[in-house]
C-alpha cells in the first residue's frame, strides 16, 4: 500500500515550480498565473530560491524589463554567493585531503555542478561534505586546527546522536560536515563505492552517482520544514532529466530497500511522475510500493510530512534512535531512548525533556514565521 506525499507545495508554489521546470509554452503560462496570484514583493523564501531557475528556463525575453532585471539580479547574486562558498568549501576539502580524509560532496553543490550545469540557478547556504564515518573525529580535529569553528561546544559528543555538524570559516562560507548522508542513519559504504568524480573550486572530491543523488533528494526534501523544502522537486526532476538513460533505477530501488526508505521514495517519485511527468518507470514505482515496509517506517514517514508538534518530534527522534541501534558504528551508544533524547537536545537531565520539546517547537515555528514574512 503506497503512502501519499504529505508535505506538498501550495498552489502558488506549484506554479513557480512549473515555471521553472516545464517546457517553454507551459512554463510561460504557469509564470503568468503565478504573477497574477502572488505579490512579487511578498514572495515566500522557498519560491524566491527557485526564481533563478525560472529565469534560465524562460530566458530574459519572457519578462518585462523590470522583472527581468530583478530576476537577473537574483541569478547573479546566487552565482556570486555560490562561487564564494565553493571556494571556502574547497579550502576545507583541501584541509581534509591533507589529513588523508576522503570527501564526498552531497546535495546542492554537487547538484549545481553535475545536474544543473549552472551554479547560479541553485541557491544554497552552505556546502555539504560527507566523510567516512570512521574518520569523523579526525575530520573535526583537522578542520578545527585549520580555523574552522564547529557549531557545537562538544562536537565529538554531538556526533554520537546526530548526522552532521556545521562549521564556519574564518572568512565567509560554511560547510555542513556529514558522517551520515541522511537524517535516517545507515551505512554509506555503497554511496562511496558508486560515487563519481567532482571538482569543486579547483579541488578534487567525489559526488553521489545519479541514482543515489535522486534518492537523497527525495528523502531529504520531503519532510516538513519551516522553510518550505519543495526545492527538492526541482532537484529530483533535474537529476532525472540530466542523467537520462545513465540513471540506474535498479540501484535506486535496491538502496531504498537497504536503507528502509521505500515508503518515502515511492511517495516522492510517484508525485514527480504524476505532477511533473518525470520519466520514472512504472515498474520502479510498482517495486517500491510493493516492497515490505514496517509499520514503524510508515509511521515515521507520515510524521515527517506533518507540521511540528511534540508527537512528531518524538516520532522522528525515535526513528533515528532505532536506526542507530541497528548500526555497528564503533561509537559509544546511548543507554536507551531517554538517554538518546537527552543527548540529542543537549539537556543535563531527562526531566527537562517535555519542557524542551515545547520550547523547541515554539522557536522553530517563530523562525518559520520570520522566514515567511515579506
Across the structure, where does each feature detected by a protein language model lie?
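Conserved NTP-donor binding/palm subdomain of two-metal-ion nucleotidyltransferases/polymerases, i.e.
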Residues: 2-125, 131-374
Amino acid at each position: 500500500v503506497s503512502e501519499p506525499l504529505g508535505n506538498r507545495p501550495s498552489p502558488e508554489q506549484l506554479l513557480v515550480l512549473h515555471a521553472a521546470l516545464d517546457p517553454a509554452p507551459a512554463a510561460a503560462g504557469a509564470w503568468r498565473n503565478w504573477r497574477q496570484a502572488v505579490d512579487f514583493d511578498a514572495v515566500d523564501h522557498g519560491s524566491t530560491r527557485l526564481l533563478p531557475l525560472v529565469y534560465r528556463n524562460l530566458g530574459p525575453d519572457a519578462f518585462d524589463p523590470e522583472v527581468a532585471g530583478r530576476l537577473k539580479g537574483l541569478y547573479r547574486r546566487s552565482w556570486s554567493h555560490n562561487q564564494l562558498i565553493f571556494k571556502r568549501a574547497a579550502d576545507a576539502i583541501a584541509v581534509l585531503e591533507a589529513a588523508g580524509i576522503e570527501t564526498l560532496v552531497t546535495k546542492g553543490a554537487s547538484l549545481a555542478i553535475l545536474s544543473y550545469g549552472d551554479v547560479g540557478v541553485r541557491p544554497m547556504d552552505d556546502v555539504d561534505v560527507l566523510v567516512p564515518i570512521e574518520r569523523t573525529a579526525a575530520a573535526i580535529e583537522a578542520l578545527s586546527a585549520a580555523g574552522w569553528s564547529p557549531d557545537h561546544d562538544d562536537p565529538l559528543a554531538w556526533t554520537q546522536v546526530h548526522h552532521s555538524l556545521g562549521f564556519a570559516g574564518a572568512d565567509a562560507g560554511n560547510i555542513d560536515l556529514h558522517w551520515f548522508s541522511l537524517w535516517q542513519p545507515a551505512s554509506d559504504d555503497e554511496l562511496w563505492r558508486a560515487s563519481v568524480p567532482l571538482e569543486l573550486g579547483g579541488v578534487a572530491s567525489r559526488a553521489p552517482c545519479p541514482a543515489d543523488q535522486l534518492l537523497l533528494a527525495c528523502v531529504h526534501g520531503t519532510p516538513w520544514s519551516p522553510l518550505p523544502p519543495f526545492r527538492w522537486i526541482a532537484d529530483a526532476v533535474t537529476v532525472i532529466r540530466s542523467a537520462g538513460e545513465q540513471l540506474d533505477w535498479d540501484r535506486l530501488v535496491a538502496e531504498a530497500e537497504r536503507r528502509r526508505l521505500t515508503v518515502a521514495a515511492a511517495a516522492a517519485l510517484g508525485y514527480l511522475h504524476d505532477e511533473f511527468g518525470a520519466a520514472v518507470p512504472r515498474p520502479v514505482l510498482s517495486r517500491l510500493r510493493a516492497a515490505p515496509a514496517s509499520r514503524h517506517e510508515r509511521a515515521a514517514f507520515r510524521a515527517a510530512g506533518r507540521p511540528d508538534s511534540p508527537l512528531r518530534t518524538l516520532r522522528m527522534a525515535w526513528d533515528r534512535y532505532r536506526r542507530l541501534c541497528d548500526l555497528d558504528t564503533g561509537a559509544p551508544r546511548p543507554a536507551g531512548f531517554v538517554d538518546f533524547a537527552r543527548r540529542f537536545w543537549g539537556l543535563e537531565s531527562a526531566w527537562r525533556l517535555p519542557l524542551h520539546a515545547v520550547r523547541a517547537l515554539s522557536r522553530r515555528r517563530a523562525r518559520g514565521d520570520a522566514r515567511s514574512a515579506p
